[in-house]
């Protein structure tokens, strides 16, 4: 990133593409590939066309926080935990990219509080952040949250079909990932853009439960991330606050783990419907899903 900041304006797009190139394999299914500079923008990456002192300060904060080494150490710790339990899942070699976010993007800064990350494709993790004190404090937890997703959807784990996958799978996946992060890093593991009010709200939980059987990942945004994200990406709001799916997923997964005497690490490949069938009645809810 520092090279991009120092480069002439006409050189920056190519450098952004170079920065993202190790992640190009995420888009192997797209005929002809994708423009990785566009992926940078879609992931709330900093605006290389309008560099400001604030962006330079953001990069410096990440450097001062030893962000890259901390994330690497956290991922190594997490991988070692999974390898020790011999889960039967192939733990992939990881390509990981930490990128500074765009401080002028109101949704990124206010709604999701400086964090956009993705680890759902085996072997690849992207983390876009704005280095607030809260984000910097959570770097390790953010990384292992994405690692849990990555291992869940690696060979030998859960098969993700974007056309048939359910909201329930995504909700449970987020709950498992947050619980895994808390197993390693305590309360820092909980995704910080989910408010305590949302986490403890029974009406939010009931509302999310009503959408669990919806299929197709194109329909997930409102149910998992909430109405604000749905509106941003052109999806239909359903009446849920930001992070509703995370909040519901955490409650459901916690109930399941307590009943099963298991951990999020041990349950990395547990089917979502199995978790929901056990957890829902414990929370006074009904789940009618099918395998």
Task: Please provide the spans of the model-predicted regions.
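N-terminal low-structure segments adjacent to metalloprotease catalytic domains
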Residues: 1-66
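Conserved mixed alpha/beta catalytic, RNA-binding, or beta-rich assembly cores of soluble enzyme
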Residues: 123-125
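Short pre-active-site segment immediately N-terminal to the catalytic Zn-binding motif
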Residues: 128-143
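Active-site recognition of the HExxH zinc-binding catalytic motif
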Residues: 141-157, 174, 178
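Post-HExxH zinc-binding segment in Zn-dependent metallohydrolases
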Residues: 163-207, 211, 283-288
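Pan-zinc metallopeptidase signature
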Residues: 209-291
């Amino acid at each position: 990133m520092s090279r991009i900041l120092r480069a002439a304006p006409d050189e920056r797009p190519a450098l952004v593409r170079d920065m993202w190139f190790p992640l190009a394999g995420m888009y192997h299914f797209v005929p002809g590939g994708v423009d990785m500079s566009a992926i940078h923008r879609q992931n709330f990456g900093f605006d290389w066309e309008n560099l400001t002192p604030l962006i330079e300060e953001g990069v410096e904060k990440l450097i001062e926080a030893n962000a890259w080494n901390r994330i690497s150490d956290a991922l190594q710790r997490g991988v070692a935990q999974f390898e020790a339990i011999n889960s039967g899942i192939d733990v992939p070699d990881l390509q990981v990219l930490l990128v500074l976010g765009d401080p002028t993007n109101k949704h990124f800064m206010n709604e999701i509080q400086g964090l956009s990350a993705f680890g759902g494709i085996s072997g690849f993790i992207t983390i876009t952040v704005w280095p607030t004190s809260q984000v910097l404090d959570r770097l390790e937890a953010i990384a292992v949250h994405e690692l849990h997703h990555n291992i869940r959807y690696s060979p030998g784990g859960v098969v993700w079909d974007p056309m048939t996958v359910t909201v329930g799978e995504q909700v449970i996946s987020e709950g498992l990932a947050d619980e895994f992060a808390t197993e390693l890093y305590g309360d820092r593991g909980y995704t910080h853009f989910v408010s305590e009010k949302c986490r403890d709200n029974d009406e939010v939980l009931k509302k999310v439960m009503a959408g669990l059987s919806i299929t197709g990942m194109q329909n997930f945004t409102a149910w998992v991330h909430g109405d604000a994200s749905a509106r941003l990406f052109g999806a239909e709001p359903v009446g849920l606050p930001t992070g509703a799916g995370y909040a519901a997923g955490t409650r459901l997964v916690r109930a399941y783990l307590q009943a099963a005497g298991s951990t999020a690490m041990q349950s990395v490949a547990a089917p979502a419907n199995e978790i929901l069938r056990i957890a829902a009645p414990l929370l006074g809810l009904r789940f009618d899903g099918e395998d």
